[in-house]
């Protein structure tokens, strides 16, 4: 049986850990694009899915391997859905989780509605011109709190309070996070799609 290799169109170590944990039981080897010399892809679009598709096609084009991209972010109700697709660069360049979190907390000062949700979109393509990309979505409801809590996770996790758990995303174990999170939900949906559409069971 041919080896199942999948390029992850990201150099984020946290994401790589989550992807490997999900796909290893399926016998899929997840390779970060940086290991294969893939250049950064522009993300010029205003929707998660368009940016995701662009990144997946770019990685497939540069590696000749099936590729998967993730585009995700936190969408805050009181800010009209911001940071949204701009989550990674909310406070500008260079990308900084600390600066992004400071800006988000600042923008929510004095607001009583602190509801937010994480969105994750995953796209997988067999090759750069794949006419049938696989698409999976995941969502995670929560609130933005004013102070950080927890040592795990990355991005906005220390400020993303999950009422159902009574703690922030950064306070959850890796197992809890994979079970509850937007990315965990999207990864499970994608795993089912890979098995059904590509035969990667």
For the regions a protein language model found, what residue spans apply to each?
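Anionic-ligand binding patches
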Residues: 2-7, 13-201
């Amino acid at each position: 049986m041919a080896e199942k290799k999948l390029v992850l169109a990201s150099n984020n170590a946290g994401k790589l850990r989550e992807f490997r944990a999900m796909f290893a039981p399926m016998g899929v080897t997840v390779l970060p694009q940086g290991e294969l010399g893939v250049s950064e892809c522009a993300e010029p679009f205003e929707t998660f899915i368009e940016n995701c598709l662009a990144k997946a096609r770019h990685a497939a084009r540069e590696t000749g391997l099936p590729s998967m991209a993730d585009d995700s972010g936190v969408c805050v109700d009181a800010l009209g859905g911001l940071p949204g697709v701009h989550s990674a660069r909310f406070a500008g360049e260079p990308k900084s989780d600390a600066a992004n979190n400071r800006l988000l907390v600042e923008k929510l000062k004095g607001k009583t509605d602190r509801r937010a949700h994480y969105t994750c979109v995953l796209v997988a393509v067999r090759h750069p011109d794949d006419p049938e990309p696989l698409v999976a979505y995941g969502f995670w409801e929560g609130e933005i709190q004013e102070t950080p809590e927890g040592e795990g996770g990355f991005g906005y996790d220390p400020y993303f309070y999950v009422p159902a758990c009574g703690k922030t995303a950064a306070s959850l174990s890796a197992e809890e996070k994979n079970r509850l999170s937007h990315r965990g939900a999207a990864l499970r949906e994608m795993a089912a799609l890979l098995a059904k559409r590509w035969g990667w069971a």
